[in-house]
Amino acid sequence: GTLANIIMLEHYIKLRRLKGKTYNVVSLDIRKAFDTVSHPAILRAMRAFGIDDGMQDFIMSTITDAYTNIVVGGRTTNKIYIRNGVKQGDPLSPVLFNIVLDELVTRLNDEQPGASMTPACKIASLAFADDLLLLEDRDIDVPNSLATTCAYFRTRGMTLNPEKCASISAATVSGRSVPRSKPSFTIDGRYIKPLGGINTFKYLGLTFSSTGVAKPTVYNLTRWLRNLEKAPLKPNQKFYILKTHLLPRLFYGLQSPGVTAGILQECDRLARRTTRKIFHLNVHTGSQFLHARIRDGGLGLVQMRYRIPCILSKRLGSLKQGNDTTNWSDIFNIEGPARSFYFRIRFLSSKGDPDPYWREEIRTRPLSSGLQDAADDASSRSWLNTIPRGWTGRDFVRAVQLRTGNLATQGLPYMAPEHRGCRNGCPRTESLSHVLQGCPLTHHERIKRHNELVAKVAKHARKKGWTTEVEPYVYHQDGQLYKPDLAIHQPDNTLVICDVQVCWEGPRPLATSWDNKRLVYDNPRFREAAVRRWGDKSLVFSPLLLGARGIWPRANVPTCNILSIPTTLRASCVHTCLKWGSTIHRHFMAGVWRRRPPDPPRPVPP
């Protein structure tokens, strides 16, 4: 693959430079390679690879039977048959071109002295599709390689483009490898441009010079992020582009022998900064909120610092264990650039897959504990991938701020301890959980949130044809009143007692709250009261719990089964909790603002 060729070229250039020896690299450009390869050459290559006659005929029929017509002034020309080239965009085309080129690569590696990779391994050419390199230790061997290559392409309908070719030819001067600045090689009588000591050429998307591969930079990332921040898009659209298109564009370029931990960390820093700008998050927002997977309670922003080394480590392991003709074990075992790169990547990837780490960070950190339960049900996280119908960009941003603990309160860590008290006068820290779940100022808003959730479940039950009582009064014989949220009468004499509650996701599992809620009614006293109210019914106690930050816990599975709650209703309840969380916080802020002491009068100037 591309990584093998890149490592090979990097290893060769740096190894020869370290030893102060001569080396020669010629980058060849094939003029319109995929458009000019002859069809007989493709047929010959397939025969050489042992492809059976039936498959040969089938493949050739897709190529040789192609034709086009040109319409000029209302008149159509005769059929113009395509005699050369392969179809652009056809997934089979690169394979056909590669097998045509394979004969040349094999011939060069067998007949030419080539470049010394290890004491037992020499390679004269590196090829990937139409990206072709010639490697030679001695400059006197390069003309023979060029002549063989030109003759091979000429007989197959292809030609080289000397203007786009480049060469690096280094001589030994005082024990050092010094690249020549004057042209040394020709193609059909025309000189190939020498690169010298400062010029570069592109190979497989990476930049190479006489010193090896160039280090990746964050220049493009900085420019892309700046344009993204200025783009007239909604916040969810910007974040989608960042995650799905922009950051993945860096993956290939960062899988380079020149990559360092510092470059990867800078990419992560820039991505986090842009994410915070998109959602108006505080600077102190924990990285676990950003880098944890969506199913683990985060936003799913890929972390380059650990993801790229993990990818590279797997690819290098596959190379080392591979069965190709190149003995990668020898290359990685001898002292040299390839070995240094191999062990550097192993060190950078020593922590392994970052996903378990960030999941544990979500679970153990005080501001994010409980969000790991987003993995229990897709409804808890689907809104992050697809914005719910009817939501505005502001709604989405506020929901993200709620999930990441960024709705403004006095209890945030940057506040001094003596200033963290609730501004409503409560003897509690003004944390987000207190504002949404406990502050008397937001009591009526919490009741509205609860009633909306109950109404959704009751509507679903009535659609099923079940008789549904909302907040029925159930008296015990000693006068004690019970008032469950829902009493749902199902067929076969079953009565489901369902109580809806919104809890804060924290260190205490929501499953514990679910059990505690069930025991409020699943006891002998309520059973006696239920018999007096409804007669001899088969009682089923199954509460419905939701997290205040939009978590649908696994504990609700029995309730979902009993009431046949669909995915759409689960998602709707989660969206209700998220929107009401924003509304409750807004009501709290408006209330404490109205109660603030008046500003002191300004002094009157004399």
Curated annotation (Swiss-Prot):
Reaction catalysed by this chain? Answer: DNA(n) + a 2'-deoxyribonucleoside 5'-triphosphate = DNA(n+1) + diphosphate
Q: Report the InterPro entries cross-referenced here.
A: DNA/RNA_pol_sf (IPR043502), RT_dom (IPR000477)
Say which domain of life the source belongs to. Eukaryota
| EC number, as in UniProt | 2.7.7.49
Q: Name all Reverse transcriptase domain ranges.
A: 1-208
Any single GO molecular-function term of the entry would be:
RNA-directed DNA polymerase activity
Q: What class of enzyme is it?
A: transferase
Q: Where is this region: Nucleic acid-binding endonuclease?
A: 331-606
Keywords assigned: Endonuclease, Hydrolase, Nuclease, Nucleotidyltransferase, RNA-directed DNA polymerase, Transferase, Transposable element
Q: Which PANTHER family match?
A: REVERSE TRANSCRIPTASE DOMAIN-CONTAINING PROTEIN (PTHR47027), REVERSE TRANSCRIPTASE-LIKE PROTEIN WITH RNA-DIRECTED DNA POLYMERASE DOMAIN (PTHR47027:SF20)
Q: What is this protein called?
A: Retrovirus-related Pol polyprotein from type-1 retrotransposable element R2
Q: What organism does the record attribute this protein to?
A: Popillia japonica
